[in-house]
């Protein structure tokens, strides 16, 4: 496990939850995750769930992705997706607004790995260097990814070589995030 990434993720999640509590006097609320089982759910309304992060309880790696491609995945990615269960978190990095992807449950974790495999299949077909996404942006074809060769974090336009360097590593990126409510 990449301890710096785990610590940075936990600290950012705490900053987000604290900001949410300051603004709304509650734990974070999600309408999108209503009806989807998770250990994060602390209460439910008629159309939303209140959630709080919980320790990840599954296998602490994304080995299914490694096995699918016979490659070694950056340790920061293993850590990012297996440190905690949480709802997706809205954030800002500089002037970039993003949604930091999180695993909501063990079922969701399997789906995330399938999506990472699909992403890598497309990159391999297009002969692009391998990246693994960690966040979505408002523009559908752009994501925040970790380069599997270097570990750097970049803004990537899907299906192209267009990448903008954002941080040298995932912990550095997470430490610079600001919560968006």
Swiss-Prot record:
It is found in: Cell inner membrane. GO terms for cellular component: cytoplasmic side of plasma membrane. Gene3D superfamilies: Syd protein (3.40.1580.20). InterPro entries: Syd, Syd_sf. Keywords: Cell inner membrane, Cell membrane, Membrane. It comes from the Bacteria. Coiled coil: none annotated. It is a peripheral membrane protein. Interacts with the SecY protein in vivo. May bind preferentially to an uncomplexed state of SecY, thus functioning either as a chelating agent for excess SecY in the cell or as a regulatory factor that negatively controls the translocase function. Belongs to the Syd family. This is Protein Syd. It comes from Shigella dysenteriae serotype 1 (strain Sd197). The lineage of its organism: Bacteria, Pseudomonadati, Pseudomonadota, Gammaproteobacteria, Enterobacterales.
């Amino acid at each position: 496990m990449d301890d710096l990434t785990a610590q940075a993720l936990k600290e950012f999640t705490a900053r987000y939850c604290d900001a949410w509590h300051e603004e709304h006097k509650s734990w974070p609320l999600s309408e999108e995750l209503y009806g989807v089982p998770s250990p994060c759910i602390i209460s439910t309304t008629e159309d939303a769930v209140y959630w709080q992060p919980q320790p990840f309880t599954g296998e602490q790696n994304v080995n299914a992705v490694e096995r699918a491609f016979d490659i070694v995945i950056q340790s920061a990615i293993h850590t990012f997706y297996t440190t905690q269960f949480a709802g997706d978190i809205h954030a800002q990095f500089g002037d970039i607004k993003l949604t930091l992807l999180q695993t909501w449950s063990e079922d969701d974790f399997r789906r995330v790995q399938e999506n990472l495999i699909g992403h890598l299949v497309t990159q391999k077909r297009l002969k692009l260097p391998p990246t693994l996404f960690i966040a979505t942006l408002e523009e559908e074809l752009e994501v925040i990814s970790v380069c599997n060769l270097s570990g750097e974090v970049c803004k990537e336009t899907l299906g192209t070589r267009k990448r903008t360097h954002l941080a040298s590593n995932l912990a550095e990126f997470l430490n610079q995030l600001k919560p968006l409510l």
